[in-house]
Amino acid sequence: SQKKYVFKYAGRNSRLDDIQAAVLDVKLKYLVEDNQHRKEVAHLYYEGIKNPIVTLPDLLPDEQNAYHLFPILVGEGKRDALHDYLEQKGVGTVIHYPIAPHKQECYAKEAWNVPQLSLPITERLADEELSLPIGPTITRDEINDVIRLINIFR
């Protein structure tokens, strides 16, 4: 696709060359440690983020989440504004699916015929989802900055 997150063709992405495999082999040695760090970051987000326009992911009992991502929902139509605000403050966030999958051009073809579907939950997620930084190298100071900036955002 020439434009990020805009898909003309249905398909999949499943590449893994030799170099990527070698890097992955090294990274796997740190998987348990990295997952534990991400769980600690997620816990700090759950404890610290108090902005009423932000909905945190459900925390289910006995769940085992690796927290590869930490997607929040930003209500009141302010997702893009919060994304831009955090970006200006040096905090990288990601909007993973700005267009609901069933509204992508690749599904507009007659064979698929899905753009007319009404999927309100999917559309809400596309409008409100924002993923916070949660990688294995994020520091406590950076986490505190993310929390502080989200809490003062209006």
Label the predicted regions:
Residues 1-154:
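PLP-dependent aminotransferase class I/II
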